[in-house]
């Protein structure tokens, strides 16, 4: 944004625009400057920025609550976060917003207990993995834990040294599938099978360029941390060591952001159509309400955006990305522990498996308490789990864990179940990229289309996770602000 765009100048400009509203046919249903669709971190960050500059903004959220995939289950035992639990030390926008809104942060974030491994229903101690006859990997792979094999072949070998490396022209050379990359790196067939089981998706469908972006950002962020402290840990465990957490759960942050917007945030408003012409935009909602604005910002996952009728329609690589971007699912079953079962069998508490649950994570809170397990099913496993009622998912998870780990018998209690695919405002968890199209999509899909702008974690450029969402909201908000002043 230009340094000339001060709050005083913006408000003055907005006043002139408002004066013109009464004489313009496009001023219908309120004459907003911007309609923002989606009240996650990206949408609310953009709304706060634009509101501070004097813009007349309304935020429409289809769900009954703001926050997007940041959600603290306050009604569950110990109120776990279902997403957005870790605030990295480099999350400048998140940290600044928390400070500005007096949202209390605490040191550390939950981490997962070290892993044992369950391969073909056989429980293997971590120290026995390298010599196990079930470990069919070869060479140096044998010493690498199953849940960190992907990191060994991608994170440790990303060619990028700068956080914007994946945006440079030469990055197109790495627009490959994970299967292609692993073959180039000489990964054994057994290693590829393990990585496939860890992710839950065919390796041919996964973009290694997208994975390299995360890997590079993580590597740069962790460069000053003792390597021994990070050894043998997956990306989430490593992040937990250096992260902070929101006291009371991450929803306290998104609730505070929503509170600053007040009546400008409207929940239960599912957008069905975005109509644009030379004079402005009309946004129509399922309940019949219409909103008129100069610009629209769609801060939605593409899994949701592609269900909205956009006129005129998107074109080229941008249309292709919105229409075809794959989204994974993470179906979660949360359990309470009555006893420390790991003391019975002497094995590490968390489990990687190639069975019904990809990861069974025993959660160690920032204060050292250990009372929760999250059993996570990805992709095809998640589809099967999601077909069950919530209580049945709990019974299934307990029975499965007791079967593969007898020491857990009688010590687990169902807390709750959640699937991001079954949330209409999310329709999936993490976004993916189609191999061979990731580079083009990355450079096309975030560009404005007519009067429609875009934001969301999937439009990351330099950051990851919560900070990527905030980054994209800020970028779109500033771009729209510039236009409002012209």
Regions found by a protein language model. Give the residues of each.
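N-terminal Rossmann-like FAD-binding beta1-loop-alpha1 element of flavoenzymes
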Residues: 34-58
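N-terminal secretory signal peptides and thylakoid transit peptides that target proteins
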Residues: 1-17
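Glycine-rich FAD pyrophosphate-binding loop
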Residues: 52-72
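Active-site/ligand-binding neighborhood in enzyme catalytic cores
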Residues: 161-269, 278-280, 299, 433-434
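Conserved beta-strand-loop-beta-strand element in the redox core of flavoprotein oxidoreductases
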Residues: 275-290
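Short hydrophobic core segments
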Residues: 37, 291-303
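Conserved flavin/dinucleotide-binding core of flavoenzymes
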Residues: 13-15, 53, 128, 280-282, ...
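Flavin (primarily FAD) binding-site architecture
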Residues: 298-314
């Amino acid at each position: 944004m230009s340094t000339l765009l001060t709050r005083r100048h913006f408000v003055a400009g907005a006043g002139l625009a408002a004066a013109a509203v009464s004489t313009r046919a496009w001023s219908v249903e309120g004459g907003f400057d911007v309609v923002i669709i989606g009240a996650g971190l990206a949408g609310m960050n953009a709304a706060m920025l634009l509101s501070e500059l004097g813009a007349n903004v309304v935020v429409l959220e289809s769900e009954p609550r703001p926050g997007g995939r940041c959600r603290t289950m306050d009604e569950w035992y110990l109120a776990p976060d279902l997403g957005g639990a870790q605030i990295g030390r480099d999350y400048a926008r998140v940290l600044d917003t928390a400070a500005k809104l007096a949202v209390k942060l605490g040191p550390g974030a939950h981490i997962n207990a070290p892993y044992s491994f369950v391969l073909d229903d056989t429980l293997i101690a971590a120290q026995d993995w390298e010599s196990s006859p079930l470990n069919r990997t070869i060479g140096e792979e044998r010493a690498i834990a199953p849940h960190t094999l992907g990191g060994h072949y991608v994170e440790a070998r990303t060619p990028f040294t700068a956080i914007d490396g994946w945006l440079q022209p030469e990055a197109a050379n790495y627009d490959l599938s994970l299967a292609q990359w692993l073959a180039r790196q000489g990964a054994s067939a057994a290693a590829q099978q393990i990585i496939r089981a860890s992710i839950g998706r065919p390796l041919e469908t996964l973009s290694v360029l997208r994975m390299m972006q995360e890997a590079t950002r993580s590597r740069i962020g962790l460069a000053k941390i003792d390597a021994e402290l990070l050894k043998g840990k997956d990306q989430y465990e490593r992040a937990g060591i250096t992260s902070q957490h929101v006291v009371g759960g991450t929803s306290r942050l998104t609730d505070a952001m929503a509170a600053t917007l007040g009546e400008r945030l409207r929940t239960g408003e599912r957008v069905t159509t975005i109509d644009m012409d030379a004079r402005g935009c009309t946004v129509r909602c399922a309940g019949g309400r219409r909103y008129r604005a100069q610009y629209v910002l769609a801060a939605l996952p593409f899994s949701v955006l592609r269900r909205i009728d956009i006129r005129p329609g998107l074109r080229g690589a941008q249309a292709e990305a919105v229409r075809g971007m794959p989204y994974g699912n993470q179906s979660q079953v949360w359990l309470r522990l009555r006893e420390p079962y790991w003391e019975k069998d002497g094995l590490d508490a968390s489990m990687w498996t190639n069975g019904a649950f990809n990861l069974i994570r025993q959660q160690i809170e920032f204060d050292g308490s250990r009372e929760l397990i999250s059993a996570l099913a990805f992709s095809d496993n998640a589809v099967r789990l999601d077909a069950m009622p919530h209580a049945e998912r709990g019974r299934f998870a307990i029975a499965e864990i007791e079967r593969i780990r007898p020491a857990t018998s009688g010590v687990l209690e169902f807390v709750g179940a959640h699937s991001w695919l079954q949330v209409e405002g999310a329709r999936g968890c993490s976004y993916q990229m189609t191999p061979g199209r990731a580079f083009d999509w990355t450079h096309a899909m975030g560009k404005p289309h007519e009067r429609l702008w875009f934001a969301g974690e999937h439009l990351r450029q330099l950051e990851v996770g919560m900070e990527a969402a905030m980054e994209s909201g800020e970028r779109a908000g500033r771009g729209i602000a510039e236009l409002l002043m012209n």
